[in-house]
Amino acid sequence: MRLDELELELVLDPDASEKAFERACILGALGRNDEALHAYYEVLRRNPEHFGALNNLAVLLTDRGSQRSALHAYEMLVERHPDSAIAHTHFASVLRDAGRSDEALAHYERALAIDPTTASAHHGLASIFSERGDEQAATRERRLGYTHRPVTFGRFRGEGDPVRVLVLGVDGEGNIPTKSLFDDRVFAIASLLVGFYDAEQALPPHDVVFNAIGDADRCALELTAANALLAHTSAPVINPPANVLVTGRVANGERLGALEDVVAPRFAIFPRWLLDRTQAEAALEASGFGWPLLLRVPGYHTGQHFIKVESRGDTATALASLPGAAVIAIAFLDTRSQDGNFRKYRIITVDGKIFPLHLAVSRDWKVHYFSADMVERPEHRAEDAAFLEDPRGVIGERGYAALERIVATLALDYGGVDFSLDTEGRVVVFEANATMIVQPPPSDAIWDYRRKPVDQIIAAVRSMLRERGLRSLPG
């Protein structure tokens, strides 16, 4: 075995940094990540400038949720290799994930100044511009990044034959975050961008298709195009585009709100020209809305471009702060508990089964797990842990049965539901679609109770993919 050979060679030549680097890479490929981490540090002890060791170390730290350490490793990479477009691009991506978008933008631009063909830097800029509501600039960067590469192939690190997964996505926001879901020791991933791929061209070889286009409000045209592409395959499809297409906020409000023991707020989508050129307040009132109400831009998540309008007179100012060509109005439902806190639950559904992901508790109406009062409040984490341990017991039989009806109605192989409970124990649905992210918890020990539930979800997705992929093989 090559690993044994390298360890013997390093005994004879302990300063051989390239052999030490090869050993670290093999350990990583075998999934022995703790040993790989230590091995990369050993490479850097021998050669502090080693590009591959710095980069791979940062990737490992990122995958472990050690964001601060990963940022430090990438910072060293850029300092020691200032003329590397790859170094600047990787550093920028982690900066963006850390919410430092101005710094990320500067490093993406530096990468493109070094090498204008760096596709991933264009992709990163597109994401930043999109987050800021500048869709014209975002579209320009996407086209620069994707036009010549509509299909990319991931590295397979396993042994034997992989399960080949064709992932359908779009050039920008609206995709299901899949980074944590695929194991490159089991699956070989081909990622295809709908909209840049010739529909008459044969699809890349695959055993199963994972439709990662998850946002029906933002990606209706792409979902329709994906449906047409799938006419060229007989392989099983995870999340058929037709099923995703009917999960927009307005459509969900109507069909889920009709279910027993499910409450959905009123939703309506308005073109901006209607609200900007007429009296917005009158248009909203004519559609049955009062104040307070919520306004959000379609296609954005995690609280972006999502605001509460307290009174009728605040409407024009609120609208002026939002980008985009359309706005969704949402009736505000006050779901505060008796203690004054808002509680938002999230479940993930995989192959029809319900998995609890988190319970966020916050004084703020706009509840998001990692922005909620979870770090400072151990009693909130205790509630979260209780939900993860026994979701049916926490939600109650009435609410859990309503969740099962929601999951059956969605008919998604992979998706999620964000919801609260009203005083009668009914489910109040905020969002139900395929875009829900399953994020491994940070490395801090206070989140240890969350690791097993997250691992169970990821394992369920991988099991579903493997089973569907193997089912399509001959014999």
Q: Which residues are covered by each model-predicted region?
A:
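C-terminal active-site "lid" helix and adjoining low-complexity regulatory extension at the edge
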Residues: 408-412, 421-475
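Register position in tetratricopeptide repeats
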Residues: 29, 63-64, 97-98, 131
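ATP-grasp fold ATP-binding core
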Residues: 256-260, 265, 283-305, 324-339
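Phosphate-binding site of ATP-dependent enzymes
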Residues: 306-402, 406
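Conserved N-proximal alpha/beta basic substrate-recognition cap immediately N-terminal to
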Residues: 151-161, 169-275
